[in-house]
Amino acid sequence: IILLLKEYQVNVPIHRVSKLKEQGYDITGTKSDLIVKMCRAVKAKNFIFGTLGRTYMNKKTFDDNNINYYFQNFEHPKYKQLHGEFVSNMSSIDLLFNHGKDSIEILGKSLGDTK
């Protein structure tokens, strides 16, 4: 993950739950409760769910904790791969190896609306 963040020039702090627990934060629970606890521990005001987040997230839990939520509507981009026909749903490492610095532009075009 750190390599991908560096290559895609994404500069964000990285927090590990194990470290938060070592610091005394209560990072337990399931689904929305767990996510909200993680957000509160790192003072996050926004959370982006994957496409399936709508199926399990509890809006009230986020609203009660003043955490904004968004849903990713990622549409997998088609791009030229080195060998054979395009194979969908590969790791972003595949995209990086096939397109190098152009990968971020390819990904950016496929993010879709997050509302």
Please annotate each region the language model reported.
Residues 1-115:
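Residues lining hydrophobic/aromatic ligand-binding pockets adjacent to catalytic sites
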